[in-house]
Amino acid sequence: PYVILHGAKHGKELDVLFEKADFAVGSLARHRSGIQNIKTLKNREYAARGFGFIYSETDDDFEKMPYILKAPADETPIEISKVIAFCKKQTTPPQEIRDSIRNLSWKEQMKKVYDSI
């Protein structure tokens, strides 16, 4: 099987599943609640773990990343075959994905605050 839904998982149980995963699913269908722009912790965790992922909202920190697959922010069904094809052609190594978000660390974000005061 290509897609397995496990329900809510936390801690070590979640870590075990991440070890088996190839790709992640971020927020989808947020347009239903009127949200178009968002910065989810979920997206950042996936990148920190070295995963490519799909999401539908606008997250300026990831919009141009090569390891991202964007879904339309509407009711269009997501074609799993397109997700699988994206994963198969994905060449960004996990460490490169992790490195791409170094500027999002608490240290870097707090430096921006400190420098502005």
PLM regions and their residue ranges:
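Structural motif corresponding to alpha-helix initiation and N-cap regions
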Residues: 8-12, 40, 77, 107
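Short amphipathic alpha-helix with an adjacent loop that forms part of the alpha/beta core around
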Residues: 16, 83-86
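Localized chelating/binding microdomains
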Residues: 14, 19, 44, 49, ...
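A conditional alpha-helix N-cap/helix-loop micro-motif detector
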Residues: 6-7, 36, 73
